[in-house]
Structures are given as structure tokens and as C-alpha cells.
């Protein structure tokens, strides 16, 4: 059975957007229109929903919606005479492979999950032999190892998917697959398809600690939890990593991933990703929607800055006025870029879109600086007025 083609994913994306998803998910009521139009039997539709709703949250995200549509079309077009009892590996999204494995472990009592005829067998987790003194501190040596693994597996956006580290998992003789999934879920509470650099470093550190006989904790420190629970991953590779929780050094763990690092050498990835790649939607309508929202937020920031300036009872000096003028001109330029993008002239120019997004982030940072500058001037004015009133009394 062929994998999902790019044109097929884009077509499903148009249908998905037409159902007005909330938080990138649609409910059963919204999906029922599409499901019932297929004229399949109710028991078949129910089975399709059960197969597609991998995370069992009663809603379908875009990846799960693609699964639903493909299963429906295979039945309607006669490509399949009946529904499979479980999803084929080529239809399992890479971001949800660990959920499939966990479900199989619950129903079969086994942590074995086979993808593309490659089987990873989990060893028994001997809880009595594990220690509870888990150490969140990442030493410089370990950090260097983690960053090497990250650089070898991250995509062009600085993200790493769960299955892209399969080669590493195979070298961890003391870490069962269930603990690998637990560590991934700890650093990825929002269940994103991929995680950013800070999350990858902590994820690898948890695996390192587990390989050295430390029990994986059930919770992460509050500072890390706030970072990992953000709504949108940060792909800024220049951002400083999270500060260590304590200063205790980690004992000799330099052997972590040595065989894996030797194996990958200078290669970009240890293994090919498993499952369907849904990245075809990047650079299409969804990117335009994001850019449009960013421009709207930028306009709002400029409007607020202008209002604060108007009520400050004093005009900007020449420097701040010039900065504001430059921002407005740059905003106008980026708005024109968006218009061209929507008209189709720049639809396939992902480089220009990336430059526009970077420029928008720069403008937002500069607007923040301008607001802080205006606030400082306002505070100085208020302080001066208070001193004048004090002298008069």
C-alpha cells in the first residue's frame, strides 16, 4: 500500500481547515459530516475513529484526520475490502509511534513494537536495582555529547522527532522502551511531533541517568516544566539552555552513546524516520496564517506603543521618533510581502518566507525595547512632577 502523497496531504489539509478546527483539533461532531458523507456503515466509521484517535482524546488533530481520510478512501475506492485491526506502520505518524507502542504494551503485556521489520525489545525494568538519586545537573562533558547527538538528528528548524533517535535507543542496553517513552513524555507534555534543543538535551540526560541505574522521575522541576509546557516550541538555537538545578557533578558517565556516536560518524541522521511525514503542509496555507497573525500582533504592539506615547504628555526625542518610523516602514514592507505571498507569487519561496518571519521577530523585539524606553521616560517625567509638587508644598 503506498504512503500518503504530498498532494493527498495538502488536499486533506484543505478539508481539515474547512471544518474550523479549534487548537488544531476537530471534535466528533465536526468530523461526522465528512464521515457520514462516505456512506460507510456505522460500525466501520466507529472502527475508523478508534484507529485514528491514537491519543484517545475524543478529537482528531491533523495527522489523525489524515489517517481517517485515507482509511475512508481506501474502502470507498475498493483498495481495501475491510479495515485493519491495527494501523499499518506506514500510516502511523512519527510523533505518535510511542503512543501506539504504549497501547500495544497495555493490551498484550509486551513492550515490543515492530516498525519496518526492525524490532526493539525492552529489558525488564528491575525497580529494586534502581536508585532514586536522580541528578538534573548536566556537566559540560555530557552537554557536549548531547549536543553532538542533537546536531546529528535535528531538522532544518532545529527540531528532533522521537523516531529519529531510534539508532540511539538500540544502544541503550539498560533502558527499556517504556522508559524511553516516559522520558519523552516528560520533556514533551504537549505531545508535539518534535521537540527543540533544550528539550532534547534534557531528554538525552534522562536516558543517560537511566542507563547508569537512576530511576526516571515522575515529574520535572518547575523551571523546566514551565519551559516544556509552552504552547509553541522555540527553535532559537542561540537561546541559552536551562540552568542546572544543582551544582553536584555527575559521576563517570562518559560512555553514554559512545557506540552510537561512532556509528553515526558525520552522518546527519542515525536512521530514517518511521511513519508518515506530514511536513508537506509547512510552507503552505498554514504558514500564511501564522505570518498573518504575527503581522496582526505587530500592528497591535505598534498601536499600543503609539497610544502610550500620545498620553505621556511629551513628544519623543528625535532618536525614538526615527526608530518608530523605521519600524512602521518595515512593517509596511512585510505587509506587502504577505500580500504577494497570498496572491501566489511567493508561494514556493520558502526562503523569503523564513526571512520575513525572522524580520517580524526582530521587529517585535525592537518594539518591546521602544516600549521600555517610553516607559522609562514616562517614569522620569512622573518623578520630576512629584519633585515639583513637593517643592511647591
Curated annotation (Swiss-Prot):
Domain EH: 8-98, 142-231
Region (Disordered): 231-251
Keyword Transmembrane: no
PROSITE patterns attached to this UniProt entry: EF_HAND_1, EF_HAND_2, EH
Record-linked SUPFAM superfamilies: EF-hand (SSF47473)
Record keyword Hydrolase present: no
Pfam families for this protein: EH (PF12763), End3 (PF12761)
Keywords tagged on the record: Actin-binding, Calcium, Cell membrane, Coiled coil, Cytoplasm, Cytoskeleton, Endocytosis, Endosome, Membrane, Metal-binding, Repeat
Principal subcellular localisation of the protein: membrane
Subcellular location: Cell membrane; Endosome membrane; Cytoplasm, Cytoskeleton, Actin patch
Occurrences of domain EF-hand (ranges): 40-75
GO biological process per UniProt: actin filament organization; endocytosis; endosomal transport
Coiled-coil positions: 285-392
Cellular component GO terms, alphabetical: actin cortical patch; endosome membrane; plasma membrane
UniProt topology in membrane: Peripheral membrane protein
GO molecular function: actin binding; calcium ion binding
Family membership: Belongs to the END3 family.
Oligomer and partners: Component of the PAN1 actin cytoskeleton-regulatory complex.
UniProt protein name: Actin cytoskeleton-regulatory complex protein END3
